[in-house]
Amino acid sequence: MARSGKKARRLVVDGQTFLWSLGHSHRALGGGYYEDCCETVVIRLFKARGRLHIVFRQGPDRLVPDGYMMPSGAVGTAEGNVNLHEPGTARALLDAALAQGWQPDDPLVKEIDGWTLFGAAARRHSAAGASD
């Protein structure tokens, strides 16, 4: 049975359970055209109210899926690319956010520009590929 794409996935880190999911948003222009595509990874500590939104917005030299030639969850720059559907990528983003001071038990929603964490995730992705 396939996993539901809408349901949050579990990620256990140092004995703590986090839930994470991936979403896509954009602004519809009409006629089947869209702009301002954005991928958002949402991470939260299990049973906590606060959430972390890691947002990857489209921009110069920043690739975000727009429905044409890029698969869902793929984001990239000249530095590399990552698949936001992969648990290893979610873990790398979580680790980078924690290193920047995100507090998982904070009851507020915090938004972080995903591109500030991208380098750490891309390096981890490259290292994992090299060890395969």
Language model regions located:
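Short, isolated positions in well-ordered beta-strands
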Residues: 13, 18-20
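Broad gene-expression machinery/nucleic-acid interaction feature
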Residues: 8, 17, 38-40
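Short acidic, Pro/Gly- and aromatic-enriched capping/linker segments at domain boundaries
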Residues: 1-12, 124
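Short, surface-exposed, low-complexity cationic segments
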Residues: 23-50
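Solvent-exposed loop and beta-edge segments used for protein-protein assembly and interaction
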Residues: 3, 14, 35-37
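Acidic, low-complexity intrinsically disordered segments
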Residues: 49-132
